[in-house]
Amino acid sequence: MMMSCRNIDLGTSVLDHSCSSSSTSRRFLFGNSSKTVCMIGGRSCVGNLVFLRRDLATCRAVPAKSKENSLVNGIGQDQTVMLNLRQESRKPISLETLFEVVADDLQRLNDNLLSIVGAENPVLISAAEQIFSAGGKRMRPGLVFLVSRATAELAGLKELTVEHRRLGEIIEMIHTASLIHDDVLDESDMRRGRETVHELFGTRVAVLAGDFMFAQASWYLANLENLEVIKLISQVIKDFASGEIKQASSLFDCDVKLDDYMLKSYYKTASLVAASTKGAAIFSKVESKVAEQMYQFGKNLGLSFQVVDDILDFTQSTEQLGKPAANDLAKGNITAPVIFALENEPRLREIIESEFCEPGSLEEAIEIVRNRGGIKKAQELAKEKAELALKNLNCLPRSGFRSALEDMVMFNLERID
């Protein structure tokens, strides 16, 4: 099926579109509004464009008028923007292909991780090795390197600095420390399909291992000698504690509001991602408004990821998750799908507030969340945050690194397709 697109009005910009594709188009968000009129198989179709995807099918979009815009607006005078349409038959995005453009950076990080933890205590090293080798995605340092290289291009840097690389290592150490402590607090036996540190070595060693990694990361952070980044990352460690306290104080509480959930999700997940992306931009010495957009990108991406994770807790199996399915609900943690399902299901409130005391009540609650709108509304929330994250990237010049950041947003959403 052939598709052709004609001139479209995107609010402040009129773009001339010419493209061909053997597939249906996906939506792409451009500025505040976007409409397209396409001829698909001789039929005129009008729709909103929401998402960007790299693919074999591409459209070349050129501003009809030369207009000088700021970096935050993302399109400078006489720049050409490549809008890419997704082929439905295309293989899903994988982190391996997404991070290909920073594969060497990630390999150097993997080689350095154990050495920078230190060799003072063999037990702590064994604990760190257990989680470092547990198939982690290295998503956060990957984001550090992608933003570092995307903003380095903007600032005219030809190579990453020592500070960029050290930041990636610090971020992964902090993330790993938080996982060790999370597993202790949640009494989790499995993570990524492997036994957790506290299951293998005991709670005492796990707590000390997490503390040690936080301390070691803080020492390396101080040696970066950048006060802005030190404050930024230090706030993340504080946010971790705030998030855990907020979660522990609201278990089985069906009056938790969506704003409370989003704040807790920011503390526990998005704060670190936002600090990672902003810190990378700071070390590239870009303008403060670009660094702030990178912070907002990390925040919105992190929130979208957390919402998707909470959806998968209801839609995937224990084998797929690498941990017990519906584990959060079983422990009374009220997440986005549950909050939305509670809006119209008094029976769900009754079950949760009873703390699943009746046989089969947990399974009943899971079915209510799955089938009564909780999942659908949570998906909409994840997409809303993803759209904002894509807009935050408009301050970056077109490059393979920016495309990979956009694909990261889409990779997350593909997990719930």
Swiss-Prot record:
SUPFAM superfamilies: Terpenoid synthases (SSF48576). The keyword Plastid applies. GO terms for biological process: isoprenoid biosynthetic process; plastoquinone biosynthetic process. One of its GO terms (molecular function) is metal ion binding. Induction: Induced by high light conditions. Transmembrane segments: none annotated. Its EC number is 2.5.1.85. GO terms for cellular component: chloroplast; chloroplast stroma; plastid. Residues 1-60 form a transit peptide. An all-trans-polyprenyl diphosphate binds at R191, K268, T269, Q306, K323. It catalyses: 5 isopentenyl diphosphate + (2E,6E,10E)-geranylgeranyl diphosphate = all-trans-nonaprenyl diphosphate + 5 diphosphate. Higher expression in leaves than in roots. Optimum pH is 8.0. It comes from the Eukaryota. Its cofactor is Mg(2+). Coiled coil: none annotated. Keywords: Chloroplast, Isoprene biosynthesis, Magnesium, Metal-binding, Plastid, Stress response, Transferase, Transit peptide. Mg(2+) 1 binds at D182, D186. The keyword tRNA-binding does not apply. Disruption phenotype: Reduced growth. Decreased levels of plastoquinone-9 (PQ-9) and complete loss of plastochromanol-8 (PC-8) in leaves. Severe increase of photoinhibition at high light intensity. The double mutants sps1 and sps2 exhibit an albino phenotype and are devoided of both PQ-9 and PC-8 in cotyledons. Belongs to the FPP/GGPP synthase family. Homodimer. Interacts with FBN5. Involved in providing solanesyl diphosphate for plastoquinone-9 (PQ-9) formation in plastids. Catalyzes the elongation of the prenyl side chain of PQ-9 in plastids. Contributes to the biosynthesis of plastochromanol-8 (PC-8) in plastids. Does not contribute to the synthesis of tocopherol or ubiquinone. PQ-9 and PC-8 are lipophilic antioxidants that act as protectant against photooxidative stress under high light stress conditions. Prefers geranylgeranyl diphosphate to farnesyl diphosphate as substrate. No activity with geranyl diphosphate or dimethylallyl diphosphate as substrate. This is Solanesyl diphosphate synthase 2, chloroplastic. It comes from Arabidopsis thaliana. The gene is SPS2.
